[in-house]
Design a protein with these regions (language model features):
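Feature captures the catalytic ectodomains and active-site-proximal regions of enzymes
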Residues: 1-515
Length: 515
């Protein structure tokens, strides 16, 4: 019997809003999605805030989105858990933080705080950095240095100067801390093994090699004057501090999201790990007490301050146990999301699951190649579907998010159009096989590229995302959330929803098993 696959198609960063100005989703030519929305059951679902386990009003992101989708439940996120610890006072009693502080005291050394200095809430929170400074002060430390990674992606591209001002004000108020270095996240938080980027930030922190400054705010302003904004600010060290990382120091990495923290943390704690990829750091620091906010990866050798919500019986595990075959496919930028994050933040092999990784193009920024590798993802997916092997497919098209982050509207418009073209071809193939597509997104981005004043807006949004079900015999409920997608797929597969999932099927009138 031929397979009739269920294909979950995630259009990363494809949100919905009525505003047209700066809205690449509305400005792009999208005949395929327009037709699908007019023909098939369509609704909108929540992808931000409390429905996905974030604080109220907090924009969603790819990690959060895919974890909620794969778990089939509301997944309370790292940001929420750590905020709760700060509020309830358990943050300052955290054993891993206190162990790092004891290490500093015993060695008469320095405490370094790494982190994305931003209130974006995607990778970090500046409030957590301030909480660490307060803890250091309470514990009597004097040599405390912040290595600030500038955002400009999940927040306004030129907001870094204000975050640095606020950090300086907090240091003055608390009575401890100096800014030791500044780096755009493009360098310090690379995740694609572009070691030339990472090395610039690492060498600044460990050797004061490269650019230097004496006034942090002026360093950023000078960068702005050269049209280089937060994300891309060249790493530089403060000549007026003794903030170089040395033997016997301690480091607390305040980022809670793993994917863009792994490389830098691995290089510091496990310096030979990337030797087979052609990179080892120029200098190694010994006897470093290293603390991650959350678990990053096994390659990172250090303590973990907080444990993530344990997710049993995720969608992938559940359908595997039922004997179904599944395919996960995405290009590099979103591969971790359809595997690691979709599986509950665990990198694991699942029986009956195949993974296809399509390399993302090697360009500086994706506005230079808005199509990214979407056509290759689409072609490989169609090739896989022709094999008649898979009951379920999870595919991610990265373009709307990754190009949306550049803030370049014409490029984002092209990105949306390319995704539409690919969705159209995938739909034709799935339809020819008698299968069903669920087309949705993990969060918004490309639909808002200008703020209210007409300035570039490069962050994610709190807007709803679409859900299209390509079956005219069914209807969809309104008011859903990302955590309802796994139960919805199980409903389509004719499988019961496991107790671990608190999401609900969004199908109103399903009486037949489709697979």
């Amino acid at each position: 019997m031929k397979k009739r696959p269920i294909v979950l198609c995630i259009l990363d960063g494809y949100g919905l809003t009525s505003r047209v100005e700066g809205n690449a989703v509305k400005l792009a030519n999208t005949p395929n999605l327009d037709d699908l929305m007019s023909i098939y059951p369509t609704t909108v679902i929540n992808a931000s805030g409390e429905p996905v386990g974030l604080p109220d009003g907090q924009m969603g992101n790819s990690e959060v989105g895919h974890m909620n989708i794969g778990a089939g439940r509301v997944v309370y996120q790292s940001l929420t858990l750590i905020n709760k610890a700060v509020k309830e006072g358990t943050f300052v009693k955290n054993e891993k933080f206190l162990s790092a502080i004891d290490h500093v005291k015993e060695n008469n050394s320095k405490l370094h705080i790494w982190g994305l200095l931003s209130n974006g809430g995607v990778h970090s929170s500046n409030e957590h950095i301030y909480a660490l400074l307060r803890l250091a002060k309470e514990q009597g430390l004097e040599k405390v240095y912040v290595h600030a990674f500038l955002d400009g992606r999940d927040v306004a591209p030129d907001s870094g100067v204000d975050f640095i001002k606020d950090l300086s004000a907090q240091m003055d108020k608390i009575g401890v801390g100096e800014i030791a270095s500044i780096s755009g996240r493009y360098y310090a938080m690379d995740r694609d093994k572009r070691f030339d980027r990472v090395a610039l930030a690492y060498d600044v922190m460990t050797q004061k090699k490269g650019e230097t400054f004496t006034v942090p705010v002026q360093y950023i302003r000078d960068s702005y004057a050269n049209k280089v904004y937060d994300e891309f600010v060249i790493p530089g060290s403060n000549r007026n501090t003794d903030g170089t990382i040395e033997d016997n120091d301690a480091i607390i990495f305040a980022n809670f999201r793993p994917d863009r923290a792994i490389q830098m943390a691995t290089i510091m704690t496990n310096p030979d790990f990337y030797s087979d990829k052609g990179y080892v750091p120029e200098v190694r620091r010994n006897n470093i007490q290293f603390v991650c906010m959350m678990k990053y990866a096994d390659s990172v050798k250090g303590d973990i301050a907080f444990s993530a919500m344990k997710l049993d019986n995720t969608f992938g595990d559940y359908i595997s146990a039922k004997g179904l075959k599944q395919l996960r496919i995405a290009e590099t930028e979103k591969y971790a999301h359809v595997t690691f994050f979709f599986d509950g933040g665990i990198d694991k092999e699942i029986e009956g699951a195949k993974r296809d990784l399509i390399n993302s193009p090697k360009v500086a920024t994706y506005d230079l190649q808005p199509e990214m590798s979407a056509y290759e993802v689409k072609d490989k997916l169609i090739e896989e579907l022709d094999k008649d092997e898979f009951d379920v497919v999870i595919v991610n098209f990265a373009n709307c998010d990754m190009v949306g982050h550049t803030g370049i509207i014409p490029a984002a418009i092209k990105a949306v159009s390319v995704v539409d073209e690919c969705v159209g071809e995938v739909y034709e193939k799935v339809s020819s096989l008698g299968g069903t597509m669920l087309i949705t997104a993990d969060h918004g981005n490309a639909e808002r590229l200008l703020d209210e004043e007409g300035n570039p807006f490069t962050a994610h949004t709190t807007n709803v995302v679409p859900l299209i079900l390509t079956n005219t015999h069914l209807a969809l409920k309104d008011g859903g959330k990302l955590g309802d997608l796994a139960p919805t797929m199980l409903d389509l597969l004719g499988l019961p929803i496991p107790n671990e999932m608190d999401g609900e099927s969004l199908i109103l009138n399903n009486e037949t098993c489709l697979v």
